[in-house]
Amino acid sequence: MAYPMQLGFQDATSPIMEELLHFHDHTLMIVFLISSLVLYIISLMLTTKLTHTSTMDAQEVETIWTILPAIILILIALPSLRILYMMDEINNPSLTVKTMGHQWYWSYEYTDYEDLSFDSYMIPTSELKPGELRLLEVDNRVVLPMEMTIRMLVSSEDVLHSWAVPSLGLKTDAIPGRLNQTTLMSTRPGLYYGQCSEICGSNHSFMPIVLELVPLKYFEKWSASML
């Protein structure tokens, strides 16, 4: 999860988020090189005593500054398109969970089970236990099995919301009357925190999301205890 004064992304815990981090580093390197080149050229222009007032055209330079940016854009666009297609890919999910946004809490339904659903509210600051996180803890966590493909169906009962968990590279809009879907898979167990990422009213900041990723055998025990 995030920590105070953090500058980078949260640690990736899903293949998609790992791809997004690699793409971010790849793009940032290109932007840094371009910025350095532009600053270098500007510094030369400001410090040189040479002038070229008689130069009318320079086709070679024009060709270079047309082709080079096109190549750079292609180098950025190709990996970006690859990740976009990966994010929309659905691979026979092992479990489906329906998420509904409300003002101002989330409700979850495990559609593969006959009667497994619950609401998830933020725990008020006055009721937190030692070690728990302010504005991020909930009374009912979403328990999911790790290393399995899980489909999340996301919608809303009232206004626009957005279901987002940064460590998993997830952000899906919850739109009234529309059912969006996304897939997730965690490569390691743990608690992963998120929040509503669409301004939805006065208590928008009080809609945390907590995923608890556990091995399959522990998930089966939990689901049996909830039925």
Curated annotation (Swiss-Prot):
Q: Does the keyword Oxidoreductase apply?
A: no
Please give the InterPro entries that the UniProt record associates with this protein.
CcO_II (IPR045187), CcO_II-like_C (IPR002429), CcO_II_C (IPR034210), Copper_CuA (IPR001505), Cupredoxin (IPR008972), Cyt_c_oxidase_su2 (IPR014222), Cyt_c_oxidase_su2_TM_dom (IPR011759), Cyt_c_oxidase_su2_TM_sf (IPR036257)
EC number(s) of the enzyme? 7.1.1.9
> What is an annotated GO biological process for this record, any one?
ATP synthesis coupled electron transport
How is this protein positioned relative to the membrane?
Answer: Multi-pass membrane protein
Which residues are listed as membrane-spanning?
A: 15-45, 60-87
Phosphotyrosine: residues bearing it: Y218
Q: Which residues bind Mg(2+)?
A: E198
Which residues are involved in binding Cu cation A2? C196, E198, C200, H204
Catalytic function, reaction form:
4 Fe(II)-[cytochrome c] + O2 + 8 H(+)(in) = 4 Fe(III)-[cytochrome c] + 2 H2O + 4 H(+)(out)
Query: Which domain of life, per UniProt?
Result: Eukaryota
User: In which residues is Cu cation A1 bound?
Assistant: H161, C196, C200, M207
Q: Which Gene3D superfamilies match?
A: 1.10.287.90, Cupredoxins - blue copper proteins
The GO molecular function terms of this record are:
copper ion binding; cytochrome-c oxidase activity
Q: Which family does it belong to?
A: Belongs to the cytochrome c oxidase subunit 2 family.
Entry function:
Component of the cytochrome c oxidase, the last enzyme in the mitochondrial electron transport chain which drives oxidative phosphorylation. The respiratory chain contains 3 multisubunit complexes succinate dehydrogenase (complex II, CII), ubiquinol-cytochrome c oxidoreductase (cytochrome b-c1 complex, complex III, CIII) and cytochrome c oxidase (complex IV, CIV), that cooperate to transfer electrons derived from NADH and succinate to molecular oxygen, creating an electrochemical gradient over the inner membrane that drives transmembrane transport and the ATP synthase.
Q: Which PANTHER family match?
A: CYTOCHROME C OXIDASE SUBUNIT 2, CYTOCHROME C OXIDASE, SUBUNIT II
Per its record, how is this protein called by name? Cytochrome c oxidase subunit 2
